[in-house]
Design a protein with these regions (language model features):
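Secreted/periplasmic serine-hydrolase-like ester/acetyl group-modifying domain
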Residues: 1-97, 193
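Short amphipathic alpha-helical segments, especially helix-boundary/capping motifs
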Residues: 63-67, 106-109, 157-162
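Second-shell loop/turn segments in exported
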Residues: 73-80, 116-121, 170-171
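Well-ordered, non-membrane alpha-helical segments in soluble/globular domains
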Residues: 80-88, 121-132
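Active-site segments of SGNH/GDSL-like serine hydrolases
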Residues: 94-119, 145, 151
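Long, contiguous hydrophobic alpha-helical segments, chiefly transmembrane helices and signal peptides
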Residues: 103-108, 112, 128, 170, ...
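C-terminal regions of proteins
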Residues: 123, 129-196
Length: 196
Protein backbone atom coordinates (compact mmCIF):
# COMPACT_ATOMS: atom_id res chain seq x y z
CA UNK A 1 0.00 0.00 0.00
CA UNK A 2 2.85 2.37 0.82
CA UNK A 3 4.35 2.20 -2.71
CA UNK A 4 0.94 2.61 -4.34
CA UNK A 5 0.11 5.56 -2.07
CA UNK A 6 3.51 7.10 -2.77
CA UNK A 7 2.95 6.80 -6.54
CA UNK A 8 -0.52 8.36 -6.26
CA UNK A 9 0.83 11.21 -4.15
CA UNK A 10 3.66 11.75 -6.62
CA UNK A 11 1.15 11.81 -9.49
CA UNK A 12 -1.08 14.31 -7.66
CA UNK A 13 1.85 16.56 -6.84
CA UNK A 14 3.02 16.42 -10.46
CA UNK A 15 -0.48 17.28 -11.68
CA UNK A 16 -0.70 20.11 -9.16
CA UNK A 17 2.70 21.47 -10.22
CA UNK A 18 1.71 21.25 -13.89
CA UNK A 19 -1.55 23.09 -13.19
CA UNK A 20 0.27 25.77 -11.13
CA UNK A 21 2.83 26.20 -13.92
CA UNK A 22 0.04 26.59 -16.46
CA UNK A 23 -1.70 29.23 -14.31
CA UNK A 24 1.57 31.08 -13.77
CA UNK A 25 2.27 31.17 -17.50
CA UNK A 26 -1.21 32.47 -18.28
CA UNK A 27 -0.99 35.14 -15.59
CA UNK A 28 2.48 36.21 -16.70
CA UNK A 29 1.34 36.61 -20.26
CA UNK A 30 -1.34 39.07 -19.23
CA UNK A 31 0.80 41.13 -16.83
CA UNK A 32 4.13 41.63 -18.53
CA UNK A 33 5.25 44.91 -19.95
CA UNK A 34 4.59 45.05 -23.64
CA UNK A 35 5.66 47.61 -26.17
CA UNK A 36 3.25 48.41 -28.94
CA UNK A 37 4.41 48.83 -32.53
CA UNK A 38 4.91 52.57 -31.92
CA UNK A 39 6.95 52.00 -28.75
CA UNK A 40 4.25 52.65 -26.17
CA UNK A 41 4.64 50.67 -22.94
CA UNK A 42 1.14 49.83 -21.74
CA UNK A 43 2.24 49.29 -18.12
CA UNK A 44 0.66 45.86 -17.65
CA UNK A 45 3.33 44.95 -15.10
CA UNK A 46 2.29 47.98 -13.04
CA UNK A 47 -1.34 46.79 -13.13
CA UNK A 48 -0.31 43.56 -11.47
CA UNK A 49 1.84 45.23 -8.80
CA UNK A 50 -0.82 47.82 -7.94
CA UNK A 51 -3.55 45.17 -7.68
CA UNK A 52 -1.46 42.94 -5.44
CA UNK A 53 0.57 45.45 -3.36
CA UNK A 54 -0.79 48.94 -4.03
CA UNK A 55 0.90 52.06 -5.34
CA UNK A 56 2.90 52.47 -2.11
CA UNK A 57 5.41 49.76 -3.00
CA UNK A 58 6.20 51.40 -6.35
CA UNK A 59 6.66 54.82 -4.78
CA UNK A 60 8.76 53.50 -1.90
CA UNK A 61 11.05 51.55 -4.23
CA UNK A 62 11.60 54.55 -6.50
CA UNK A 63 12.18 56.90 -3.56
CA UNK A 64 14.82 54.59 -2.07
CA UNK A 65 16.52 54.19 -5.44
CA UNK A 66 16.54 57.94 -6.08
CA UNK A 67 17.72 58.84 -2.60
CA UNK A 68 20.67 56.44 -2.95
CA UNK A 69 21.54 57.63 -6.47
CA UNK A 70 21.29 61.33 -5.64
CA UNK A 71 23.35 61.00 -2.45
CA UNK A 72 26.49 61.22 -4.61
CA UNK A 73 27.97 64.63 -3.81
CA UNK A 74 29.92 64.55 -7.08
CA UNK A 75 26.75 64.89 -9.15
CA UNK A 76 27.24 68.05 -11.17
CA UNK A 77 25.88 69.10 -14.54
CA UNK A 78 28.64 69.72 -17.07
CA UNK A 79 27.87 71.55 -20.31
CA UNK A 80 30.71 69.69 -22.03
CA UNK A 81 29.68 66.23 -20.78
CA UNK A 82 29.51 63.27 -23.14
CA UNK A 83 25.72 63.33 -22.69
CA UNK A 84 25.40 66.87 -24.05
CA UNK A 85 27.92 66.11 -26.80
CA UNK A 86 25.84 63.08 -27.82
CA UNK A 87 22.67 65.20 -27.82
CA UNK A 88 24.32 67.82 -30.05
CA UNK A 89 25.58 65.14 -32.46
CA UNK A 90 22.18 63.44 -32.55
CA UNK A 91 20.39 66.74 -33.24
CA UNK A 92 22.90 67.55 -35.98
CA UNK A 93 22.28 64.19 -37.67
CA UNK A 94 18.51 64.73 -37.48
CA UNK A 95 18.84 68.25 -38.91
CA UNK A 96 20.88 66.90 -41.83
CA UNK A 97 17.99 64.54 -42.59
CA UNK A 98 15.41 67.36 -42.25
CA UNK A 99 13.74 65.55 -39.36
CA UNK A 100 11.64 67.83 -37.17
CA UNK A 101 12.52 67.60 -33.48
CA UNK A 102 10.63 68.68 -30.38
CA UNK A 103 12.46 68.49 -27.07
CA UNK A 104 10.77 67.93 -23.74
CA UNK A 105 11.61 67.36 -20.11
CA UNK A 106 9.75 64.37 -18.68
CA UNK A 107 7.14 64.97 -16.02
CA UNK A 108 8.00 63.69 -12.58
CA UNK A 109 5.42 63.22 -9.85
CA UNK A 110 6.06 65.48 -6.87
CA UNK A 111 7.74 62.81 -4.66
CA UNK A 112 10.54 62.62 -7.26
CA UNK A 113 10.95 66.38 -7.24
CA UNK A 114 10.94 66.30 -3.42
CA UNK A 115 13.90 63.89 -3.43
CA UNK A 116 15.80 66.20 -5.80
CA UNK A 117 15.12 69.10 -3.43
CA UNK A 118 16.01 67.14 -0.28
CA UNK A 119 19.25 65.96 -1.91
CA UNK A 120 20.30 69.58 -2.46
CA UNK A 121 20.28 69.12 -6.24
CA UNK A 122 17.46 71.48 -7.22
CA UNK A 123 20.02 73.97 -8.52
CA UNK A 124 21.72 71.29 -10.63
CA UNK A 125 18.36 70.16 -12.00
CA UNK A 126 17.54 73.75 -12.99
CA UNK A 127 21.02 74.16 -14.51
CA UNK A 128 20.47 70.98 -16.55
CA UNK A 129 17.14 72.36 -17.82
CA UNK A 130 18.82 75.69 -18.65
CA UNK A 131 21.46 73.87 -20.72
CA UNK A 132 18.75 71.91 -22.56
CA UNK A 133 16.97 75.21 -23.17
CA UNK A 134 20.17 76.71 -24.59
CA UNK A 135 20.49 73.75 -26.98
CA UNK A 136 16.87 74.23 -28.08
CA UNK A 137 17.38 77.98 -28.63
CA UNK A 138 20.62 77.45 -30.54
CA UNK A 139 18.91 75.01 -32.91
CA UNK A 140 15.55 76.83 -32.92
CA UNK A 141 13.71 73.82 -31.50
CA UNK A 142 10.59 73.75 -29.38
CA UNK A 143 11.13 72.72 -25.76
CA UNK A 144 8.41 71.71 -23.33
CA UNK A 145 9.13 71.39 -19.61
CA UNK A 146 6.62 68.97 -18.12
CA UNK A 147 8.53 68.75 -14.84
CA UNK A 148 7.29 72.09 -13.53
CA UNK A 149 4.98 72.05 -10.50
CA UNK A 150 1.74 71.82 -12.48
CA UNK A 151 -1.66 70.56 -11.38
CA UNK A 152 -0.80 67.15 -12.86
CA UNK A 153 2.67 66.85 -11.33
CA UNK A 154 1.31 67.89 -7.94
CA UNK A 155 -1.79 65.62 -8.14
CA UNK A 156 -2.42 63.92 -4.77
CA UNK A 157 -1.08 60.41 -4.41
CA UNK A 158 -3.43 57.57 -3.44
CA UNK A 159 -0.56 55.50 -2.00
CA UNK A 160 -2.64 52.86 -0.23
CA UNK A 161 -4.90 52.25 -3.22
CA UNK A 162 -4.89 48.99 -5.14
CA UNK A 163 -7.17 50.42 -7.83
CA UNK A 164 -5.21 51.53 -10.90
CA UNK A 165 -7.77 54.27 -11.59
CA UNK A 166 -6.83 56.14 -8.41
CA UNK A 167 -3.54 57.55 -9.74
CA UNK A 168 -4.50 58.80 -13.15
CA UNK A 169 -1.21 60.33 -14.30
CA UNK A 170 1.65 58.31 -12.75
CA UNK A 171 2.49 54.69 -11.96
CA UNK A 172 5.31 55.86 -9.71
CA UNK A 173 7.29 59.12 -9.46
CA UNK A 174 9.33 58.64 -12.63
CA UNK A 175 6.91 56.73 -14.87
CA UNK A 176 3.86 58.50 -16.19
CA UNK A 177 0.76 56.85 -17.56
CA UNK A 178 -0.86 56.98 -20.97
CA UNK A 179 -3.23 59.72 -19.81
CA UNK A 180 -0.26 61.98 -19.06
CA UNK A 181 1.44 61.00 -22.31
CA UNK A 182 -1.67 61.91 -24.29
CA UNK A 183 -1.84 65.32 -22.62
CA UNK A 184 1.85 65.86 -23.38
CA UNK A 185 1.37 64.95 -27.04
CA UNK A 186 -1.62 67.30 -27.26
CA UNK A 187 0.48 70.11 -25.80
CA UNK A 188 3.35 69.49 -28.19
CA UNK A 189 1.32 68.83 -31.34
CA UNK A 190 -1.49 71.34 -31.12
CA UNK A 191 -0.59 73.61 -28.25
CA UNK A 192 -3.45 72.32 -26.10
CA UNK A 193 -2.31 72.32 -22.47
CA UNK A 194 -5.79 71.94 -20.99
CA UNK A 195 -6.55 69.14 -18.54
CA UNK A 196 -9.76 67.33 -19.44
Amino acid sequence: HWIQGKEQLSFLLSQSALFDTFLTLIQQKSDVNALSENGFNDGRLYHHIVRSEGFAVLYQQKQQELTARLANSALKVQADSTGFQALELFLQLLAEQDIEVTLFVNPYHYPYLDVIQQSGLQGEFERWKDLISAVAQKRQLSLYDFSIASELVMAPLQESSRDIRDNKYFWEPAHYRQTMGTLMLDAMQVGNCQVQ
